[in-house]
């Protein structure tokens, strides 16, 4: 892991791109540990963490990300513990008084931000969005294929 200590909480980079600028390293040269299992993230996991636009977390002043296994595992735990409700796209727009395109919706499985096309697919295929831990979620195209009938019903 990059052993740069960030003691001042106000100056800590929140994204991997910001962290790269501060430590003056390209993205794929960053060495981060997983905040959950403490294993070193692979180059692929670092890239995926940046693509997913998740926030860097700090423990004792050091930056951490999350590995693929822990991300999927803790997303499942989060879904099981904090599921609130499920609604169709039109209902979600009425409930929030915002268009789907203006809502920040992540995949409940892998945490990728949903694209406008993925949000539209939910409407076209009459799939629901899920409120989990006070956030609206759905399925990205990659996870859509991996979801079973019981999982899609949340």
Curated annotation (Swiss-Prot):
The keyword Hydrolase does not apply. It comes from Human papillomavirus type 53. GO terms for biological process: DNA-templated transcription; regulation of DNA-templated transcription; symbiont-mediated perturbation of host apoptosis; symbiont-mediated perturbation of host ubiquitin-like protein modification; symbiont-mediated suppression of host innate immune response; symbiont-mediated suppression of host type I interferon-mediated signaling pathway. InterPro entries: E6, E6_sf. Belongs to the papillomaviridae E6 protein family. GO terms for cellular component: host cell cytoplasm; host cell nucleus. GO terms for molecular function: DNA binding; zinc ion binding. This is Protein E6. It comes from the Viruses. Forms homodimers. Interacts with ubiquitin-protein ligase UBE3A/E6-AP; this interaction stimulates UBE3A ubiquitin activity. Interacts with host TP53 and EP300; this interaction inhibits TP53 activity. Pfam families: E6 (PF00518).
């Amino acid at each position: 892991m990059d052993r740069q200590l960030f003691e001042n909480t106000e100056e800590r980079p929140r994204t991997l791109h910001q962290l790269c600028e501060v430590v003056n390293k390209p993205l794929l040269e960053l060495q981060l540990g997983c905040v959950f299992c403490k294993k070193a993230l692979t180059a692929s996991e670092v890239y995926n963490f940046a693509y997913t636009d998740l926030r860097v977390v700090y423990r004792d002043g050091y930056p951490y990300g999350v590995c693929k296994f822990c991300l999927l595992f803790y997303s499942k735990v989060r879904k099981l513990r904090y599921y609130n409700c499920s609604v169709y796209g039109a209902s979600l727009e009425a409930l929030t008084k915002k268009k789907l395109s203006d809502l920040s919706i992540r995949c409940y499985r892998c945490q990728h931000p949903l694209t406008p096309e993925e949000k539209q697919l939910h409407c076209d295929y009459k799939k629901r969005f899920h409120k989990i831990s006070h956030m609206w979620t759905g399925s990205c195209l990659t996870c859509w294929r991996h979801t079973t009938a019981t999982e899609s019903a949340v």
